[in-house]
Amino acid sequence: MNFLQKPRGVKDWFGDELVYFNWIVKKIRSLAFNWGFSEVKTPLFENAQLFQRSNANADIVQKELYQFFDKSQRELALRPEATTPIVRLACENKLMQEANFPLKLFCIGSMYRYERPQNNRFREHWQFSCEVFGFSNLFIFLDTLLFANSLLEALGITGYVLKINNLANFETLSKWNKALKDYLTPYKLELTELSQKRLEKNPLRILDDKIDQKKSFVKNAPKITDFLDASAKQDSELLKTQLKKHNISFEWTDNLVRGLDYYTGFVFEYVKNQDTILAGGVYDNLVEELSSNPTPALGFACGIERLINCLEIDKKAFILNTKPKQMLVICLFEEALEELVWLAKLWREYNQVTIYPKVIKVDNGIRLANRLGYTFIGIVGKTDFDKKAITIKNLVSKQQTIYTWNELGERNVF
């Protein structure tokens, strides 16, 4: 393996893609603050048992967890998702107090899953995750859905489908799981190898399998609606009424399940071009599972890479046009270089300036600035230098203006 080649399933961030990344993160962070969330950061690795307890039968633990022993033989794991670490953070730091509710936290960071790399699916991926603790009633769920809608709207992402289901509670899920196992067992040999393994421990995930979910016998499998009690059915109807009342388009999807074990109650996905771009739901039992402290909760997450992929072409053009305006300053004779190195320190108070550290001809300097992505080039020739001035050329509009050195040190000239 070439040590100068990045590992499989990860990507380098630079150029235009990094501009999109930073723009999205800035938008999301600003919006999250507006919706009352506080930012937190958790370690890249946690005790492996944290994920093994919260998602024992999920693929991210069974197959995809990056786990290892450190030099003291402690079993650790790179975080595959952010919800469980945020719960751990809130419990350990005593944020999970009733006086703090609703406690609204968000995290932006990299997650790690050992899975086969595919288009927009990486072993290291970046994710925004937000969580609300202390409530999980209809109104806080609606508020969370509206936040998700606003997030996609702020990014200019359209053409998605909102899918919703009600998983009720663990008792209901247990009954549904048993019914699915009984129903699907006669079809076991017609399932994929992965689904055959899931049939024993987690048959719900078969409904989410991209191959098996298209098969007619899977489509005809028992639905969770067959096991919902009167209260859960009423909750579903109330949610549908509220969504219709506020003109939020949705599809009620009876076979929608999430890939993580801790979800109960309402779950949802925003799907565009068959890819899930944002998803989440209620997980009322997770906090109690980890801390013995019953606390209702809900939240959602979205992958930054997938959001970038969903940006329209005109939106990407807009983002590139709003990136910081940077200038490459070139000198046409040796004596100017030493002076400009000191001057540039003052200019950088208001302007983004890079000094090219050797004498260069104008044409070569312009070609270099264009190749490196600069918006402006500053040219200092003998006449400019004697007048303590600089000629600045806009490489897009081709317009050029002469400024004094003092002007660059007093304001943004771009």
Curated annotation (Swiss-Prot):
Among InterPro entries, the record links this protein to:
aa-tRNA-synth_II, aa-tRNA-synth_II/BPL/LPL, Anticodon-bd_dom_sf, His-tRNA-ligase, HisRS-like_core, HisRS/HisZ
Q: What are the EC numbers?
A: 6.1.1.21
Could you tell me where this protein is found in the cell?
Cytoplasm
Does this entry carry the keyword Cytoplasm? yes
The terms describing its cellular component in GO are: cytoplasm
Return one Gene Ontology term, BP aspect: histidyl-tRNA aminoacylation
Taken from the record, one Pfam family name reads tRNA-synt_His
Q: Report which reactions are catalysed by this protein.
A: tRNA(His) + L-histidine + ATP = L-histidyl-tRNA(His) + AMP + diphosphate + H(+)
What molecular function does GO assign, one term? Answer: histidine-tRNA ligase activity
Extent of the signal sequence = none
Top enzyme class, one word, equals ligase
Q: Which UniProt keywords apply?
A: Aminoacyl-tRNA synthetase, ATP-binding, Cytoplasm, Ligase, Nucleotide-binding, Protein biosynthesis
Principal cellular location given in the protein's record? cytoplasm
SUBUNIT field: Homodimer.
PANTHER family under this entry?
HISTIDINE--TRNA LIGASE, MITOCHONDRIAL-RELATED, HISTIDYL-TRNA SYNTHETASE
Similarity annotation: Belongs to the class-II aminoacyl-tRNA synthetase family.
Report the protein name in the record: Histidine--tRNA ligase
- Which species? Mycoplasma genitalium (strain ATCC 33530 / DSM 19775 / NCTC 10195 / G37) (Mycoplasmoides genitalium)
